[in-house]
């Protein structure tokens, strides 16, 4: 399901959200929460509004891109009618294709995110910067709830050496590094200097740059250069799907007893469920899902978090 976001700068976010809910109530189903968050549900799609420091965020979703553009237009036009005392700028991100098996109800999504540990200013700024710099590719960034899960799992694993295969702009790197002990180290693998150059600044701001060792180049080469023994306590795989089976094998053989490997996008937008989908990535991930379920070296669970997350724990 395609979606698009906009951040509106204002010192009166609650006022604008209340006005939108009140004014659009005659043509849409609206819900205003006690914490100032709101959902506007139109026939063509939905828009969730969330107060943030310095303004508010709008997240529009719809079944198709044309409908999404309509939702954005309706909400923007109504919002600007109220801006008589200041000039509001509503800059929507490009529509991001729905690479998830299903989209959560905005009410459920909003409730879920509200009841996770709150996102901080560094991660919030990184989300905005990623959207500005990468456009439609911003959909590759992990969500706040998934990032919170990574921090918790990394901390629970007790890992001193962690691996990340696929860095993008560094959001997940921050989350993992924050879960490591002070002497912990994250070996982060990616092939893009452009996207990881964004990451470095935010690693510094988050105070975790000294824990992250970025390796630019094919991840398989980096993994195979590691000692062929149990040295890794935590790993996160979120890179090219065609290579998932190879990444998993190189990682799992190096996991310490009790170590965790987490794999993102194991649903591939629901395409792994249907064997009619047979491109290289779909075949690779579908096959790996079966492999992990039967792998006696690990105990695993697959969770319906966003586009599917598998957590496997090394036994023995």
Language-model regions, residue ranges each:
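N-terminal intrinsically disordered, cationic/polar leader segments
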Residues: 25-31, 37, 43-46, 50-63, ...
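Conserved SAM-binding loop and adjacent beta-strand
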Residues: 101-102, 116-120, 135-149, 155
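N-terminal auxiliary segments of SAM/dcSAM-dependent transferases
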Residues: 93-123
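Short glycine-/aliphatic-rich beta-strand segments at the starts of folded cytosolic domains
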Residues: 1-19
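S-adenosylmethionine/decaboxylated-SAM
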Residues: 144-316
